[in-house]
């Protein structure tokens, strides 16, 4: 065997095979060095490399890691609606992994933001599965294009931090398929992540790590996943059951490989199943071999910082811009002919930025430039007052007084507000959507002293805006912007670039408007997903709920017009949408064209509309472009629990094209043939179901003809009786028609048996 060739599982002993199915320590695979299988490193995280300085000892220190580029977490990056940019972020992350000899980076996380109080919302992409999947795939493809693996997580239904290690998420098959699976499914089918990390929680009574239906039936057999499945850290509670379910790798190791050996010897695990799981680990090592063999590689720190800078720019969402208060005029620095505005900067976040979330994804950045640092570097003058401390302690009157005095003497005030890290992190959920009260009070005091206030928010998940929005002419939602957030904010605030971010999550007026609150965060060890598929805007828009800001919303310094929307069928249940978008302003900027599909009459309750396509277009002043978005069959389908499959009903569908879920420019319609699925009819099928079925309709017609001929009793023809009739299983016809009803039911069953042979 050559040194460059890894063995087949056939070359290993039983004990060696078993050893491959658990880690070597908290951050390494367990290799078999004697057989040429190295124990490569795997480590966090979703928005940049977090390689612990103590990793070699198997310890975990979330605040002590090698310097790496801190890109915007998913809460910000998702607002870019720019998969190409996200792909560049993935490529840069991979290059840093190569330098640090990390074979697999643990991310991205594509769990749905079921409830905005989720403590880990900063690390996830969206309330919408289509957007989450079509953005996060950029990380997977970008990283793996460089020969480094990703770990798509947390599969599945890890949608809260409360009791996350054991809570039983009780979810309907339809909600799983339409909301909680699609981001995973899309990335698996299109990008084949090299690893997937299962979640801690149970799904309908079974822990994810021991869930054969989840890890094998759905993930591998149905979706065609080719990689390995690892546990979240400490999520494997039964080595044998997990391996049988389809878990390749226990992390971190529990040093119980002998349990696998004994289970194979006594027949609880078949040799073939162990071989499959162990061979998957060998295949993973093979995939990463080339990249891990590169020595003395050094990534370009400045180039990666520029990628982080661009990512931060496109993450910023402008929520309000009354009186065109933005962009600000920095004077000769930005415009040689302009007089500078006197600027006050208030808020500790401007000096001490909150640029990432807390927990396992915490990164030590290669650089860190605050907004105040950026102003100094660019020669832009501003008076600063911290106003408050970055904790949950009561307000400091001296800091408040200083801030108000600073505001009085300014032409415009930039107030940097938001959530301190103590308010949201991995490990716990939030209990309110509000900003800390001391910050709202300070804003009111400052607005009373100066009407020209722009609020710049720093937060990992949405916060309510309506209670204090009247005190600000401008609002920028900047999320957590990574290490280059300061320069990015300056670029947007002073007009070097127009904001182009769009919300990936609705901002509700009140947390109690969210439909999941009736089952949040659960009770007695379980949480019921009673809202079903009506998550986020699917609920708010369907039921006409007022919101602070709708899904997909975001303002620009430019203005745009969408015209010429047209749809053309490309198949029985597929279509293509074309639209022209025009920049009608004198500002170069980007706009995101969003396509929503609205079903017509359906057999099940469906959301008013759902995002099924988008594209981001950069347009110079006055420029127009035509965009094309393809809609596949899944764009029109829902998961039918009756058929246990995706189902497209025949009929007319509305295609809405706009710039948010509530800003629809034009609507067109397309008529689809449907997939023709039918379910066998029985005596328990209603008369209405018989009428709607192709075979059943012929039999219903035969019943009517036989009634006219006197061969069968005639059915009632008045509207009220027909209503009762249509809702009745045909075996109940005797209750309506007596003995004649029994004859009709038997006739229908007999005729169906003939037609369906």
Swiss-Prot record:
Keywords per UniProt: Carbohydrate metabolism, Hydrolase
Active site: 232
Biological role: Catalyzes the hydrolysis of a non-reducing terminal alpha-L-arabinopyranosidic linkage in ginsenoside Rb2 (alpha-L-arabinopyranosyl-(1->6)-alpha-D-glucopyranosyl) to release alpha-D-glucopyranosyl (Rd). It is not able to hydrolyze alpha-L-arabinofuranosyl-(1->6)-alpha-D-glucopyranosyl (Rc).
Organism of origin: Bifidobacterium breve (strain ACS-071-V-Sch8b)
Protein name: Exo-alpha-(1->6)-L-arabinopyranosidase
Keyword match Hydrolase: yes
Pfam families: Fn3-like, Glyco_hydro_3, Glyco_hydro_3_C
Activity regulation (UniProt): Completely inhibited by Cu(2+) and Fe(2+).
Enzyme Commission code(s) on record: 3.2.1.-
One GO MF term attached to the UniProt entry: hydrolase activity, hydrolyzing O-glycosyl compounds
Chain ranges passing through the membrane: none
Temperature curve summary: Optimum temperature is 40 degrees Celsius.
